[in-house]
C-alpha cells in the first residue's frame, strides 16, 4: 500500500512539474535557438521545419505567423540597451542603422502582441518612409507626447514591445553575419 502511495505521489509531482515547466516556457519563452544583438532578440528557426518544440508551443499559443527563413527574420525588443523595460510614459530613442535588407518594418505592440491604440493611428514605420540622415542612419522617437521627425506614439501605455522585421536579409541565415549585424540602439532618454 505504501509503495502504491509513493508511486502515485511521484507521478502526480512529476506531472505537475512537467506541465508547469511547459507552461512557463510556452508563455515566457526560452533562449533556446535565440539570436541576441543588443536589446534585440530573434528566433531565426521559427519559420522553418527545424523549429524547437518550445517555440512551436509558443507560436501555437499566440497565433503568431512567423516569417519564413527565405523571407526574412523578426527581431523583438522589450527592454532598452541597458535592460530597462520599455515604458510608454518615457521617451525612448531608437537610432542607428539596420542590417542589410531589401525592406523592413518597425512596429509598436503592447505586451499581448496587439497594436497600440493612439490618436494618430500610427503603429510603425517602414524603411521606405522613415526620415534618414546623410549617413543613412535614422533616429526614431517612441514617446507618448508629440515629437518632431520620426515619432511613434505609445498612447501612454506602461509596457510595450518593438518588432523589427527584416525582409530579404542575410541575418539569421548566414552564420557569419548574425552577431556582427548592425542593429539600431534603443535608449531611454527621459521619463516624466
Regions found by a protein language model. Name each.
Residues 1-192:
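A compositional/structural signature for long, glycine/proline-rich flexible linkers
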Amino acid at each position: 500500500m505504501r509503495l502504491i502511495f509513493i508511486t502515485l505521489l511521484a507521478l502526480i509531482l512529476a506531472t505537475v512539474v512537467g506541465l508547469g515547466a511547459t507552461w512557463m516556457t510556452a508563455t515566457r519563452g526560452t533562449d533556446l535557438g535565440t539570436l541576441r544583438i543588443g536589446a534585440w532578440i530573434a528566433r531565426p528557426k521559427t519559420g522553418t521545419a527545424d523549429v524547437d518544440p518550445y517555440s512551436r508551443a509558443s507560436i501555437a499559443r499566440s497565433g503568431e505567423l512567423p516569417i519564413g527563413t527565405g523571407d526574412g527574420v523578426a527581431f523583438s525588443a522589450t527592454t532598452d540597451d541597458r535592460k530597462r523595460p520599455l515604458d510608454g510614459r518615457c521617451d525612448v530613442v531608437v537610432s542607428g542603422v539596420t542590417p542589410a535588407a531589401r525592406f523592413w518594418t518597425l512596429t509598436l505592440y503592447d505586451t499581448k502582441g496587439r497594436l497600440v491604440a493612439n490618436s494618430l493611428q500610427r503603429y510603425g514605420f517602414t524603411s521606405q518612409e522613415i526620415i534618414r540622415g546623410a549617413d543613412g542612419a535614422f533616429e526614431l522617437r517612441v514617446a507618448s507626447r508629440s515629437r518632431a521627425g520620426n515619432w511613434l506614439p505609445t498612447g501612454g501605455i506602461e509596457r510595450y514591445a518593438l518588432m523589427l522585421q527584416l525582409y530579404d536579409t542575410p541575418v539569421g541565415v548566414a552564420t557569419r553575419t548574425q552577431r556582427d549585424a548592425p542593429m539600431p540602439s534603443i535608449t531611454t532618454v527621459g521619463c516624466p
